[in-house]
Every structure is written in C-alpha cells, then in structure tokens.
C-alpha cells in the first residue's frame, strides 16, 4: 500500500460554554510514502489544528485519520506515544530545543526516550548533525546557535528515529528568506536520501511551491490541491 496517511472528513470543534467554534470542516486527503506536501493558508485557517490531529497530539471531533494503516483515534495513549516516538517527527516555528542541553544531546533525546543506550544514541546524533552541516557545533547549546542552526538541529532531532513522516508547522517562520530557502532545500535533500515524507504547513507561497504537491486551506477546508 502506497498511502502513508489518510485523512477522511476530519472536523474539529472547540466549545467554550455555549459558544462553538468549528475550526476544521471536513478535511480529506491522502499522503503517499516519501511525498513532499505543503499546506498553505492564512493564520487561523486551521492548518496547525490539522497538524496536531495528524500527529496524534489532539483528537478530531468527527472523521478519521489513518496512519500506517491504523486509525489513530482508536489507539491507546501509550500506542499513540509510541507512534510519535518511532514513526513521526515534528518541527515547529519555534525550535523547542532544551536550553540546558547541547545540540548533540537534544538530537539524541528521542533515541534515549525510546530506550537506546547513550553511546549509540550520541553516535547517531553526531552523524545526523554532521549531515545537516553542524558537525562542528555539536557541543553548543541553543543560545549559542543562530536561528538557522537551531532549526537544523530541530530537523535533525525530528529525523533521528528515521520516521515515516515529518510534520512541520511553519518551520521557517522565524527565519530570514535566504535561511528559509536553505532549510527547505535541506528538507528536500533529506527526503531524497531517506524517503521520509514531509507535510509542511506554511503561509509562504514561494516556499510551498518547492514541495511536490501543495494544498490550500481556507476557513477550515482544503479548497485547492495542485501538483498531484
């Protein structure tokens, strides 16, 4: 089966008292293995909410998400956590690196959480940091790195477990345009090398166009799919 992810009629409604706000209004799409896909849309259109549901960080109010042939909402919390650790990678606009740990320790963290011994985890982290051009910065903490370097560390951390899919939420939102382009080029290179699929949320049309396929989200709906 070539489909990695299937999203069918996903809705999300938040309720505060008597007020209901529907953020997602029946989102459906499929993502193939190794595919590079972007979702573009303005702030508040539902992009980040969708990504949280796809990553098993939030539940849909209606609809279904299948990942690796499994319905995410039917899995226990422990099984969802295992999928996040072993099969999914996450990159955000803010890097969310641990401030008191070095680049090497940050990248090794998912491996250690998964039970790998320290020496092997650090060796894998070292190799991946070298691949993203930061072999000379492994001992530096996030405060000692530039914005682009911090995002490269975050991408390395997302890829260290060789996930099937990386979910990236505005990964270049805090970067200048030149650095943003380099981050997107890096994601394409890593995709070609590893076969990891990327689903990237952005508001930048030029960057979105670098993906194999790009979708447009407006008012909680995917209204346009191009490049398929």
UniProtKB/Swiss-Prot annotation:
Q: Name one Pfam family in it.
A: ABC_tran
InterPro entries (alphabetical): AAA+_ATPase, ABC_transporter-like_ATP-bd, ABC_transporter-like_CS, LolD_lipo_ATP-bd, MacB-like_ATP-bd, P-loop_NTPase
Residues covered by the ABC transporter domain: 5-228
UniProt xrefs under SMART domains? AAA (SM00382)
**Keyword list, A-Z:** ATP-binding, Cell inner membrane, Cell membrane, Membrane, Nucleotide-binding, Translocase, Transport
Q: Name one GO molecular function term.
A: ATP binding
Q: What is its main location?
A: membrane
Enzyme class, top EC level, equals translocase
Topology term for the membrane: Peripheral membrane protein
Keyword Aminoacyl-tRNA synthetase attributed = no
Which branch of life, at top level? Bacteria
Q: What is its biological role? A: Part of the ABC transporter complex LolCDE involved in the translocation of mature outer membrane-directed lipoproteins, from the inner membrane to the periplasmic chaperone, LolA. Responsible for the formation of the LolA-lipoprotein complex in an ATP-dependent manner.
Quaternary structure (record): The complex is composed of two ATP-binding proteins (LolD) and two transmembrane proteins (LolC and LolE).
Q: Please give the family membership noted in the entry.
A: Belongs to the ABC transporter superfamily. Lipoprotein translocase (TC 3.A.1.125) family.
Q: What is this protein called?
A: Lipoprotein-releasing system ATP-binding protein LolD
């Amino acid at each position: 089966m070539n489909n990695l992810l299937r999203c069918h009629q996903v809705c999300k409604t938040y309720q505060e008292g008597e007020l209901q706000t529907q953020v997602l209004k029946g989102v459906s799409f499929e993502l193939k293995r190794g595919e590079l896909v972007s979702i573009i849309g303005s702030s508040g259109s539902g992009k980040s909410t969708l990504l949280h549901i796809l990553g098993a960080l939030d539940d849909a109010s209606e609809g279904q998400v299948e990942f690796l042939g499994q319905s995410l909402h039917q899995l226990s919390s422990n099984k969802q956590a295992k999928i996040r650790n072993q099969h999914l990678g996450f990159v955000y606009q803010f890097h969310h690196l641990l401030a008191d740990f070095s680049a090497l320790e940050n990248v090794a963290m998912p491996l250690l959480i998964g039970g790998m011994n320290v020496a092997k985890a650090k060796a894998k982290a070292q190799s991946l940091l070298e691949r993203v051009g930061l072999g000379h910065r492994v001992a530096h903490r996030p405060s000692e790195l530039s914005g682009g370097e911090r995002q490269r560390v975050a991408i390395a951390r997302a890829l260290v477990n060789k996930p099937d899919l990386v979910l990236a939420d505005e990964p270049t939102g805090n970067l200048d345009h030149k650095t943003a382009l380099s981050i997107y080029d890096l994601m394409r290179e890593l995709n070609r090398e590893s076969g990891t699929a990327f689903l990237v949320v952005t508001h930048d049309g030029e960057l979105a166009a670098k993906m194999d396929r790009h979708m447009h989200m407006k008012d909680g709906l995917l209204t346009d799919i191009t490049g398929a």
